Amino acid sequence: MIQQESQLKVADNTGAKRVKCFKVLGGSRRRYATVGDVIVCSVRDVEPDSSVKKGDVVKAVIVRTRRNILRKDGSSLKFDTNSCVIIDEKGNPKGTRIFGPIAREIRDRGFVKISSLAPEVI
């Protein structure tokens, strides 16, 4: 579960390495976000010559969490890191590559472009 002040790794090639969440979208008093939810975050660490700069406010979709993801068939899934992918206003990824596996719930939430760029969908 991701909440305000949570720090996440960035799983794409926009040049951002780490972001800090400061708002969970989807309700006036919503506190937590999980896989497939959109958050507003601030870029904390960047690589040189990146498309985003330190301090930029961006939207991102969460693709991996350390918290268990419970599925309807009774199985559960969790990852080693909390990670996100930076998106634009239309919901398309800003980067052209995605690193590491992502959860199947991303495709179910309508982020088909992100799931097609990912090397593995679990």
UniProtKB/Swiss-Prot annotation:
Nucleotide-binding listed as a keyword: no
Record-level GO cellular component terms: cytosolic large ribosomal subunit
Gene3D superfamilies (UniProt xref): Ribosomal protein L14
GO biological process, alphabetically ordered: translation
Membrane-traversing stretches: none
UniProt entry tagged with the keyword Ribosomal protein: yes
PROSITE patterns listed in its UniProt record: RIBOSOMAL_L14
UniProt KW keywords: Ribonucleoprotein, Ribosomal protein, RNA-binding, rRNA-binding
InterPro entries found in the cross-reference section: Ribosomal_uL14, Ribosomal_uL14_bac-type, Ribosomal_uL14_CS, Ribosomal_uL14_sf
A Gene Ontology molecular function term of the record: structural constituent of ribosome
PANTHER family documented for this protein: 50S/60S RIBOSOMAL PROTEIN L14/L23, LARGE RIBOSOMAL SUBUNIT PROTEIN UL14M
Classification via HAMAP family: Ribosomal_uL14
Family as reported in the entry's similarity comment: Belongs to the universal ribosomal protein uL14 family.
Record's subunit section: Part of the 50S ribosomal subunit. Forms a cluster with proteins L3 and L19. In the 70S ribosome, L14 and L19 interact and together make contacts with the 16S rRNA in bridges B5 and B8.
Role description: Binds to 23S rRNA. Forms part of two intersubunit bridges in the 70S ribosome.
Entry protein name: Large ribosomal subunit protein uL14
Top-level taxonomy: Bacteria, Pseudomonadati, Chlamydiota, Chlamydiia, Chlamydiales
